[in-house]
Amino acid sequence: MAGFGLPNFGQLTEAFKKAQEIQQNAQALQDELDGMEIEGKSADGRASVWLSGNQQPLRVRLDPELLSAGQETCEAATLEALQAAYEQSTATMKGRMEELTGGLNLNLPGMGG
């Protein structure tokens, strides 16, 4: 019997299947992001910071010459490298999430708008 304001069950079933698929792939994506090492460098290349795809800090490398350049220079270069790594890591995460959700536009927190 048609009507009664009920949704098309074929569409509802398809949406449910898509949600299940996303959920199943979410853990694999989490593991993939955790395993990534994304490097950010200072403008002069003397400081490098590595983050995972989930923005977890992994390691820092500072050129010995940078260390002798003074505290402010060293801090500025480290911050530049951290910002670059964060931007790349965030962009990677956002791109992978968009692939996972198939463009469903879920507007997830922390993923821009």
UniProtKB/Swiss-Prot annotation:
The lineage of its organism: Bacteria, Bacillati, Cyanobacteriota, Cyanophyceae, Synechococcales. Homodimer. Binds to DNA and alters its conformation. May be involved in regulation of gene expression, nucleoid organization and DNA protection. It comes from Parasynechococcus marenigrum (strain WH8102). GO terms for cellular component: bacterial nucleoid; cytosol. NCBIfam families: DNA_YbaB_EbfC. Belongs to the YbaB/EbfC family. InterPro entries: YbaB-like_sf (IPR036894), YbaB/EbfC (IPR004401). Gene3D superfamilies: Nucleoid-associated protein YbaB-like domain. The keyword Cytoplasm applies. Pfam families: YbaB_DNA_bd (PF02575). Keywords: Cytoplasm, DNA-binding. It is found in: Cytoplasm, Nucleoid. GO terms for molecular function: DNA binding. This is Nucleoid-associated protein SYNW0027.
